[in-house]
């Protein structure tokens, strides 16, 4: 005797808008937390998701060029980026953090942009007290894709910035934008 399949419950794909690829490019003038340098890495959190880059040893101007990909179910969520100094024998030291909204980027994605020339600036986000931008952030149409470049000024620390770039990945079968 076979049993009937239970009614399908909602899956992650039903709520998933798509994937947000955050390229952590580099750190600039990060704080010294060891004797003469730091061993920095970045942790990115959005909702319950948490991802991290590799550690770059003895460098306050590290180049990660590392992609961290988050699944997006809510465009109102903010992304928290925290830089840490890796320590071998003690707790890792915090080297500052920055927060940014993905909503302006998502809103630009929802526009019909096909046919725009590569390099077209679609929108800009200005630095303000409500965001951690060190300079104006441009959302640009590049080779058929929308990217947003960010220079984030770290908070709760004496100095340091992190350069990052956002890119969207559509997933077949997801709710989409």
Swiss-Prot record:
Cite the effect that the entry attributes to residue 50 to A: Small reduction in the ability to bind liposomes in the absence of free Ca(2+)
Lineage top rank: taxon = Eukaryota
As for subcellular location, the record says: Cell membrane; Nucleus; Cytoplasm, Cytosol
| Key words of the record | Abscisic acid signaling pathway, Calcium, Cell membrane, Cytoplasm, GTPase activation, Lipid-binding, Membrane, Metal-binding, Nucleus, Plant defense
Q: Which Gene3D superfamilies match?
A: C2 domain
Chain positions recorded as Ca(2+) 2 binding sites: 34, 39, 85-87
Checking PROSITE patterns in the record gives: C2
Q: Which GO terms describe its biological process?
A: abscisic acid-activated signaling pathway; defense response; positive regulation of abscisic acid-activated signaling pathway; positive regulation of defense response to bacterium; positive regulation of response to salt stress; response to salt stress
Q: How does it assemble?
A: Dimers and oligomers. Binds to PYR/PYL/RCAR abscisic acid intracellular receptors in an ABA-independent manner, both at the plasma membrane and in the nucleus. Interacts directly with PYR1, PYL1, PYL4, PYL6 and PYL8. Binds phospholipids in a Ca(2+)-dependent manner. Interacts with YchF1.
Q: Tell me, in a sentence or two, what this protein's role is.
A: Mediates the transient calcium-dependent interaction of PYR/PYL/RCAR abscisic acid (ABA) receptors with the plasma membrane and thus regulates ABA sensitivity. Stimulates the GTPase/ATPase activities of YchF1, and regulates its subcellular localization. Promotes tolerance towards salinity stress by limiting the accumulation of reactive oxygen species (ROS). Promotes resistance to bacterial pathogens (e.g. Xanthomonas oryzae pv. oryzae and P.syringae pv. tomato DC3000).
Its name, as the record gives it, is Protein C2-DOMAIN ABA-RELATED 4
Gene name tied to this protein: CAR4
């Amino acid at each position: 005797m076979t049993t009937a399949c239970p009614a399908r419950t909602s899956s992650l794909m039903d709520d998933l808008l798509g994937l947000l690829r955050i390229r952590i490019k580099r750190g600039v003038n990060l704080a010294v937390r060891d004797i003469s340098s730091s061993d920095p890495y970045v942790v990115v959190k959005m909702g319950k998701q948490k991802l991290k880059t590799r550690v770059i040893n003895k460098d306050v101007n590290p180049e990660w060029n590392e992609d961290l990909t988050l699944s997006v179910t809510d465009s109102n969520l903010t992304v928290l980026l925290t830089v840490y100094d890796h320590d071998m024998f003690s707790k890792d030291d915090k080297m500052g953090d920055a927060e940014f909204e993905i909503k302006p980027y998502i809103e630009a994605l929802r526009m019909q942009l096909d046919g725009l020339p590569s390099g077209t600036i679609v929108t800009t986000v200005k630095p303000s007290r409500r965001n951690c931008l060190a300079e104006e952030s441009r959302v640009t149409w590049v080779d058929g894709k929308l990217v947003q470049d960010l220079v984030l000024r770290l908070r709760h620390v004496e100095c340091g910035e992190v350069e990052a770039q956002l890119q969207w990945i559509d997933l077949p079968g997801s709710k989409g934008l």
